[in-house]
Amino acid sequence: MIIKEAKDAKRGRVHSRIRKKMEGTPERPRLNVYRSTNHLYVQVIDDSKGATLVAANTLEFGEAKEGKRPTGGNLSAAKQLGKAIAERAKQKGINKVVFDRGGYLYHGRIKALADAAREGGLEF
């Protein structure tokens, strides 16, 4: 069984390899995804300026149970997040992005987020 530290270290190595080849420009900024245990965080980043242009996370959309933080680690929250990031990017005049999956497999929540962002009008 692979322990969590080993999995995370492997993902970090994959992500650094991907980042060497990928760069967000003002014309096509980078759509970066971070997946925690309970939430997803998405940013549209212009790497030439080193600035975050648009950001969203599932903390904004999850349903909170009594006395607890909202949950956002599921497919429905990922779909809502994809639509929200696409809408916010379009408001800033961003239509095309480069998708940076952050070393995560293109499966599950990451795939749902990407598909929803495409449905929302982002091209990648």
UniProtKB/Swiss-Prot annotation:
One of its GO terms (biological process) is translation. The keyword ATP-binding does not apply. GO terms for molecular function: 5S rRNA binding; structural constituent of ribosome. CDD domains: Ribosomal_L18_L5e (cd00432). GO terms for cellular component: cytosolic large ribosomal subunit. Keywords: Ribonucleoprotein, Ribosomal protein, RNA-binding, rRNA-binding. The keyword Magnesium does not apply. Pfam families: Ribosomal_L18p. This is one of the proteins that bind and probably mediate the attachment of the 5S RNA into the large ribosomal subunit, where it forms part of the central protuberance. NCBIfam families: L18_bact. Belongs to the universal ribosomal protein uL18 family. Part of the 50S ribosomal subunit; part of the 5S rRNA/L5/L18/L25 subcomplex. Contacts the 5S and 23S rRNAs. This is Large ribosomal subunit protein uL18. It comes from Koribacter versatilis (strain Ellin345).
